[in-house]
Amino acid sequence: LFQFGMRHGMRSYTTGSAWWQGPAGPYWGHNAIINLRAFEARGRLPTLAGRAPWGGLVLSHDMVEAVSLQRAGYETRVLPDEFGSHELNPPCLPEFVRRSLRWCQGNLQYVQLVGRADWHPMGRLQLAMAILMYLSGAAWLVFMTLGFVQGAFGLDGGEIAANPWGAPPSGLGTALLVAMITMTFAPKLAGLADALLDGRARRSYGGGGALVTAGVVELLHGMLLAPIMAFAETFFIGRLLTGRGLAWRSQARDGRGVSWAEASRRFWGVMLAGAVVVVGFAQLAPGLLVWIVPVAAGPLLVIPFAWLTTRPWLGRALAGARFAAI
């Protein structure tokens, strides 16, 4: 399902970002055409100050290599086209989370590099966006929590010491929530619309009805997955702040089932966080419970979610029906 969502969602996202990034875009270490002479001469990685996990060798190398090439006067462009190949995603939730946390550790190393004045401004923006990609989950949780606490205790801006400027405009919270949802789902909705309007693409997905049905299911899947990842990444950032990181090893790409025991061992903390959120609001503000469903449903269901999404019979059934075709 995630790969299906990436197929149409990333096409529209990449098309838009490639337009404004122009010749100073990012580079990913797959499906790339590289000027080897320039890459060897100008793409060498710096060694970061300090010890791992924040210092030492650069882990997320490709973005830094792109910025180094831009500094030397070369272009790095993203071509938002499909050429018949793509990178496979991890086959189960534990491996998916492991890869994301590995990237999180690598991207947060960019805090040492983003301020370099001799690098292209667009390249520095790319590094800043890569950092924010992983800080955004924690920021989202803080934003939602503060909003719910404010509502639960009936506080306005003038009663909260952290806001000395008084009460915010009445519609600001709603506008922020709408903006957040729009930024999250707009690329996928645009990609679905593009595929529906293109007869060849529509047929490659199994037809319009199959595309729309799978698109709705994938959106629901994404709504469960997003808060799971936000909690997992927030916990991991806290771990990084204590100097503990992950070993950078290759990810598993072969499909495998996740047992109840493994799912429980890996995700009990995320489930507990979701339960704390639900119990807290049930006690303090039961009227707000409906609003925390998007945040708490994924963490509460993470263990059966990790188990169910790796069942061989489910994968065979979806593939046999060409559901969520990629």
Stretches with model-predicted labels:
Residues 1-118:
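Internal catalytic domains of large membrane-associated glycosyltransferases
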Residues 22, 89-289:
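Basic/Trp-rich segment in TM-proximal cytosolic loops or flexible interdomain/linker regions
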Residues 84-85, 248, 323:
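Generic preference for hydrophobic/aromatic residues in regular secondary structure cores
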Residues 182-185, 291-311:
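Alpha-helical membrane-embedded segments
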Residues 307-326:
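Cytosolic/matrix-facing juxtamembrane and C-terminal tails of multi-pass cellular membrane proteins
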